[in-house]
Regions:
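Compositionally biased, intrinsically disordered low-complexity segments enriched
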Residues: 133-152
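Terminal interaction module
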Residues: 18, 116-133, 151-215
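N-terminal start-of-chain detector that recognizes signal peptides
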Residues: 15-20, 59-62, 95-98
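Charge-rich, low-complexity segments
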Residues: 1-55, 181-215
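Conserved NTP-handling cores and scaffolds of large molecular machines
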Residues: 11, 66-70, 112
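A glycine-rich, hydrophobic loop/mini-helix early in the fold
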Residues: 33-90, 94
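A short linear-motif detector with a strong N-terminal bias
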Residues: 22-27, 66-69, 101-105
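Core of folded catalytic or high-affinity ligand/protein-binding domains
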Residues: 72-131, 156-158
Length: 215
């Protein structure tokens, strides 16, 4: 970063640091204590869809590696494509096995990065829920009213931005057209996890990952 960047207040982009994913298990303990959320056991890695044999080979190797885990229970690792054209590698573990889930996400990111597909990596998402359906304390974005979920489980994703090396919370609200988020809860989670994770400070980068698998 040069002198002109300093004078103009520009900041050097944060390099990807996949090891920050390993901070999620401790953050989950804080999150449960602060807001009542627990892991769902679902998580996923999002990347720009890539066609070609080279990518298919890497994907198959990663899936085979993760599915070979003797301790894995439930659905096998799968590749899905969302309505926006992005691809997601999805892993599902037991809710109590968050460290293993984080290991899966780290392995997927690392394999794609090592094979030259780092530029296609976008984010990783780990799902949480509050089955108690605690009422949110404020209005949600685009809802024009209370962020309460009417007694149903609240959902929350902790999103890791690969190119930023930062995390942010995303909480979609149930009902309606599925395009509302609980902004007040997201801000509450940001404050609660400030000492556990490197939180993305630019709120404009808190992109809504509607329909993210594993969330």
């Amino acid at each position: 970063m040069g002198l002109l960047d300093i004078l103009l207040g520009r900041t050097k982009p944060v390099a990807p640091d996949l090891d920050r994913l390993f901070g999620l298990p401790s953050a989950a303990v804080t999150l449960q204590a602060a807001a009542g959320f627990t892991p769902t056991g679902g998580g996923s890695v999002c990347f720009a869809t890539v066609e070609g044999a080279a990518f298919d080979d890497v994907r198959k190797e990663v899936q085979a590696l993760l599915d070979a885990d003797a301790e894995r229970t439930g659905a096998p690792v799968e590749l899905v494509r969302d309505e926006y054209g992005y691809s997601w590698m999805v892993s599902r573990r037991g809710p109590e096995d968050l460290p293993a889930l984080v290991g899966d996400l780290h392995a997927v990111n690392s394999a794609l990065e090592a094979s030259g597909f780092g530029p296609q990596l976008l984010c990783s998402v780990v799902g949480f829920e509050d089955v108690g359906g605690s009422e949110s304390s404020g209005a949600s974005e685009g809802s024009g009213g209370s962020g309460g979920s009417g007694g149903s489980a609240r959902r929350l994703g902790l999103v890791y931005l690969y190119k930023r090396g930062t995390f942010y919370p995303f909480s979609p609200l149930p009902g309606g057209d599925g395009q509302r988020r609980d902004s007040s809860l997201e801000l509450q989670v940001r404050a609660a996890l400030a000492d556990d994770l490197r939180i993305e400070q630019d709120l404009n980068r808190w992109f809504p990952v509607w329909g993210a698998p594993g969330l």
